[in-house]
Amino acid sequence: MKYHDLRDFMSQLEKTGELKRVGVEVDTYLEMTEICDRVLRAEGPAILFEKPKGHSIPVLANLFGTPKRVALGMGEESVQALREVGKLLAYLKEPEPPKGLKDAWDKLPILKQVLNMAPKKVSNAPCQEIVWEGKDVDLSRLPIQHCWPGDIAPLITWGLVVTKGPHKNRQNLGIYRQQVLGPNKVIMRWLAHRGGALDFREFQLANPGQPFPVAVVLGCDPATILGAVTPVPDSLSEYQFAGLLRGGKTELTQCIGSGLQVPASAEIVLEGVIHPGEMALEGPYGDHTGYYNEQAEFPVFTIDRITMRKNPIYHSTYTGKPPDEPAVLGVALNEVFVPLLQKQYPEIVDFYLPPEGCSYRMAIVSIKKAYPGHAKRIMFGIWSFLRQFMYTKTIIVVDDDIDIRDWKEVIWAMTTRMDATRDTTLVDNTPIDYLDFASPVAGLGSKMGLDATNKWPGETTREWGRPIVMDADVKKRVDTMWQELGI
């Protein structure tokens, strides 16, 4: 199923019971978070709060609160089918030359589809049906959530931030939280290595003293939202990738006040600039780690204009101790990562980011081990392969006889195949998420790799244990007599 815009997606979810409307008044201050947290932990539906206290604009929350809804948003019917999305990304990341005429012919539809997915520019876009300018620009008119008791201010959580560097042909989409400072100002919390921050830095070097144009999209079609959190190859824009997922070109319209382009069917768009040198102290906020993060300075985004559809919908979420929506997204996108990793390291059998690991801080990988030291090669390969894994603190490597999605199996491998000194790899002074207060220095800390594979000659001088396995014929005989046993 493909979706033209957010409302189309919501309509389809509602028909299948995957979206429920809440008609009673609910406060954006804390109440909304508590309701969403309970619903998400129960693997419940997306919620449309029709009467946020003090506001006329409804709030859509818990949209991607189950892996199934993430898959549906990507145009697939099941989480397992996301492997096909990963295979497509792996091919686009490193396309292989055709092995012959037939292979070239087979690959032609994919290449043609990619070329045909350049975004389509439109005018008279729905997202500009209503325009607030001047004194009308007031963020308090939007039902922005105040998620946790210790949060310093309301927080924009699902904003797709659109930027463009001076030397790039394509725009960048990123999701960065934004603390509300006043009627027309928010703090743009982007980390230094993220696309938006890189675009801003390059713009400042090329245009000293000039304001940097930014647009923030609040609520758009699911393919575009998910494209912004997927490891899209640098040769492909997130808008193009969204078109591939959707099976139709992403329709864009130009912002009123800048050359940036935003989804034409977006619900709400914030247009404005970041002035060089204008910074503010951000936080504290409850984060996906389950703790309040420490404060840090980030650029201030000044909003000149707010455009929206008629009867707009505000898309929101919260972050907290797993499971939360980012953790659920991590579980689903895990299936996209597997083919990408297997393309680079064919010996990888499976890869898993347990949601308890705060989306990316711990990874477990199973391999077809082929030589001594193989596990260590995989550890360093994963840490350096995708930007998403730069902050992974712990990697556990096991053999292909272990189901890495079953903690009982993983712990058995760790306790029977590991020696603490020999099989632990520690790496110091590596990039760490600055939100990780456990690291000795903000943004810099250590990583740990655990080799829980069977050891080969060269890794041990001892005779290695053989796992106990029941005779296959006996298992079959017991299977056939099981009903008769009356157990």
Curated annotation (Swiss-Prot):
GO terms for biological process: ubiquinone biosynthetic process. This is 3-octaprenyl-4-hydroxybenzoate carboxy-lyase. It is a peripheral membrane protein. The active site is at 287 (proton donor). Its EC number is 4.1.1.98. Belongs to the UbiD family. Catalyzes the decarboxylation of 3-octaprenyl-4-hydroxy benzoate to 2-octaprenylphenol, an intermediate step in ubiquinone biosynthesis. Prenylated FMN binds at residues 175-177, 189-191, 194-195. One of its GO terms (cellular component) is cytosol. Pathway: Cofactor biosynthesis; ubiquinone biosynthesis. It comes from Dechloromonas aromatica (strain RCB). Homohexamer. It is an enzyme of class 4 (lyase). Keywords: Cell membrane, Decarboxylase, Flavoprotein, FMN, Lyase, Manganese, Membrane, Metal-binding, Ubiquinone biosynthesis. GO terms for molecular function: 3-octaprenyl-4-hydroxybenzoate carboxy-lyase activity; metal ion binding. The gene is ubiD. Its cofactor is prenylated FMN; Mn(2+). It holds the Pfam family UbiD_C. InterPro entries: UbiD, UbiD-like_C, UbiD-like_N, UbiD_bacteria, UbiD_Rift_dom. The keyword Membrane applies. Mn(2+) binds at residues 172, 238. Its main location: membrane. The keyword Membrane applies.
